[in-house]
Amino acid sequence: MASTTPEVKPGTTLHLLAGSSAGLISAFTLQPFDLLKTRLQQQQRANVGYRSSISRELKKLARFKDLWRGALPSTLRTSVGAGLYFTILSQTRTYVAQLRARTDKLPHSQTSVLPKLSALDNLSAGFVVRAVVGFITMPITIIKTRFESNMYNYNSMYEGVEGIYLDGKEKGSLRNFFKGTIATLARDCPYAGLYVLFYESMKNEFVPKTLILFDQQEQLENSTLVNSSAAVVASSLATTITAPFDAIKTRLQLDSHTVGGNSIMSVTKQLLKEDGGVRNLFRGLSLRFGRKGLSAAISWCIYEELLKSGRLQRLLH
């Protein structure tokens, strides 16, 4: 039965709070995936022929809680980044929808309170917003990566900031906090654009049509399953396409004295020359699959459900 209650659109504060909460929970829960992925991708300097593996990296850990090393910068980066990303993305998509006069012609999805856009609009919005947020959060991204690696033994955020600031050829330069920016954006921008494109397509078309075969009435209860399923599929597709830039980004942010220089081209050549060849560009892909898929399912599910939470909206008004 259709409700006569007028729809209350989520405000900017709600988007920021929902996005930050979703990012915080997913980042802390899935930190072990990030730590192991970083260690698989880092250069094995002690033995050129040595090839690391998940089991070998797990055996190196002295305590179970070491899997959460780097959790503080990771949660800071993801909660702040997710809050900004979801907020700016929502505002951008709403603006584009209004600009194209589609708000009346294209109603909201039954499983979402977000505006519906064309495939190109979704791709462009995700790409541009991720570029902005990625640049803003780049310093904390480098701190996070170095905390996760066993190449650096930082014991505090202060040590991490100081170590990066005084590191490499650019000693005492703020540029050190933006190493690997191009590689990171080359990974994150296409990923975000493709993710939003795949997510909206899956959420509004493929997944609902699949689920309706099993349940034609419980729309509200199914919304969580629809959003989570769409998020996992979208994340898997986008992750595979952008995997090489993830390996390049990690190596750039960890190695201060890379042979041949610190550039995307030089690092790519170095990765290809190392034992494993082209496969090195996809090292850690299985962990990134798991991390990104679960993170997307958790983040977007929590985000969209919080947006639809009447109680939370009332608290903010």
From Swiss-Prot:
Coiled-coil spans are none
Q: Extract the PROSITE patterns matched here.
A: SOLCAR
Among its keywords, does the record have Transmembrane helix?
Answer: yes
Entry's localization field: Mitochondrion inner membrane
GO cellular component terms given for this protein: mitochondrial inner membrane
Spans of the Solcar repeats?
10-95, 117-205, 222-309
Could you confirm whether the keyword Aminoacyl-tRNA synthetase appears in this record?
no
Which protein are we looking at? Mitochondrial glycine transporter
